[in-house]
Structure formats: structure tokens, C-alpha cells
Amino acid sequence: MKENEKDLIKAISNLVQLDIDAVHAYDQAVKEVDDPIIKERLLKFQEEHRNHISSLAEHIRNLGGQPPGKSKDFKGYVIEAFAAIRSFTGLKGALKAMRITEEITNRYYGEVVSWEAPAEVKEALRTYFSEEKIHLDYIISNLQAMP
């Protein structure tokens, strides 16, 4: 396996881990969201993160790597705890926690999407980065609309 393939596998594995961590953070956040429209949208975002995990794990295997397990890493525990604490303050706190989670995810997708990769991997990364931007934009828009 070439060095750049190893680096790509590691980068995609880090994205998978971020998506795993985001799924757990959404679990905490949606518990405190009473607004049915926002809750439904957050659950949709969580499902998109699950889809990213499955798809990117398959790409990792196709590249000859082994995807990470579906448990949180240390950063994931911190993100989940932060989401839980913020969510206790209700909808606004939950959205603030998810904004931070999505900012981290967007930042890393933004870096990795520019890497050299096989066409099908590149397309998946572009699609998922686009979805991540939608998640963040939605959360920011709702926060800005709140008093």
C-alpha cells in the first residue's frame, strides 16, 4: 500500500470517527428538543451521519484499510458530554452544542475533500461535505432566529 493511500485511509477513518461522535452527540441533543420540526430535522441529520459512517467504512475497506469501530473515542466522549450539558438548557443549548459538533465536522471534511482520492471516494466526500454544510447552516439559522 502506498504512503498516500495510508494517509487517505487514516483521514477517512478520522471522518468516520467524527461522524460516530456526531451520532452520539445528536442522541443527547434531541432528548431536549421539544420543537417537532427541529427535532425531525436533527434526527434526519443524525441519520445522514450514520449513512456517512457506513459508506465511508466501505470505502476504507475498498482501499485496503480497516474502518474504526462504532464506539466513541475520547474526543467523542467529550463532545457527547458537552452536548448533554448544553442540552439541559433546552433547545438553544442543544443547538449550540450541535453547532460546535458540526463546525468540527465541517472543518475536517473541508480539509479532506481536497485530497487526491479515487473518483468514487472523492464524490462521496463532496456529497457528505455538502450535507455537513447544510447541517451547520440549518443550526446557525435557527440559533440566529432565537432571542
Predicted features and spans:
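Carboxylate-rich helix-loop segments that flank metal/cofactor sites and access channels
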Residues: 54, 58-96, 100-106
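Preference for long, well-ordered alpha-helical segments
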Residues: 101-147
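Conserved alpha-helical segments that form or flank metal/cofactor-binding pockets of metalloenzymes
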Residues: 37-73, 135-147
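Alpha-helical scaffold segments that form or flank carboxylate-/histidine-based iron centers
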Residues: 7-15, 34-54, 91-95, 120-131
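Short alpha-helical hairpin
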Residues: 1-2, 24, 75-80
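Membrane-interacting alpha-helical segments
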Residues: 1-9, 63, 81-92, 142-147
